[in-house]
C-alpha cells in the first residue's frame, strides 16, 4: 500500500512568500503553517515575472531558498524561471533537493535528459500546467 504524503506549495513573488488557494494568493499561510502541520515536502515556486534568471529579483529568491533550507527539515522542490543547466546548478547549491522544469521542458525537451544525467534523475521533476475548460 502506498504511503500518503503531505506536500504543500509555496509561491514567491518578488521575494514575498505566500500560499495559494485556487491559484489566488492567501498571505495568511507562510512557512510557519508548513512547520506547524509537519508536511513531508515543500514545493517552492518563484512566480516573479522576470525575463532573465540572473536578474536582481532572483537574489531575493535565492536568499529565501537558503533561509527556508536552513530552517526546514523537509525536502525542497524548487521551480520557476529555470532555463538552463546552470540555473539548476545554482538552485541545487542554494538548498533545493529537486527542481521543477515546466516551460523549459517544452522549449527544449533535451534539457530533461541532460539535467537527469548531470544531477541525477531523482532530482528532476517535470510539471504540466493544465486548465479544464
Predicted regions and their residues:
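Short beta->alpha connector loops at strand-helix junctions that form conserved
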Residues: 80, 101-104
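A short, small-residue-rich loop immediately preceding and capping a beta-strand
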Residues: 74-76, 80
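Conserved N-terminal beta1-alpha1 strand-loop-helix module at the mouth
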Residues: 1-74, 85-86, 90-93, 107, ...
Amino acid at each position: 500500500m502506498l504511503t500518503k504524503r503531505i506536500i504543500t506549495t509555496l509561491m514567491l513573488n518578488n521575494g514575498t512568500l505566500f500560499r495559494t488557494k485556487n491559484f489566488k494568493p492567501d498571505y495568511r499561510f507562510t512557512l510557519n503553517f508548513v512547520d506547524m502541520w509537519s508536511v513531508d515536502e515543500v514545493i517552492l515556486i518563484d512566480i516573479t515575472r522576470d525575463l532573465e534568471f540572473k536578474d536582481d529579483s532572483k537574489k531575493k529568491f535565492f536568499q529565501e531558498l537558503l533561509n527556508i533550507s536552513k530552517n526546514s527539515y523537509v525536502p525542497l522542490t524548487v521551480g520557476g524561471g529555470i532555463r538552463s543547466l546552470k540555473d539548476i546548478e545554482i538552485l541545487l547549491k542554494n538548498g533545493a533537493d529537486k527542481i521543477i522544469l515546466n516551460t523549459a521542458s517544452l522549449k527544449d525537451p533535451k534539457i530533461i535528459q541532460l539535467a537527469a544525467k548531470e544531477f541525477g534523475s531523482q532530482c528532476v521533476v517535470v510539471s504540466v500546467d493544465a486548465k479544464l475548460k
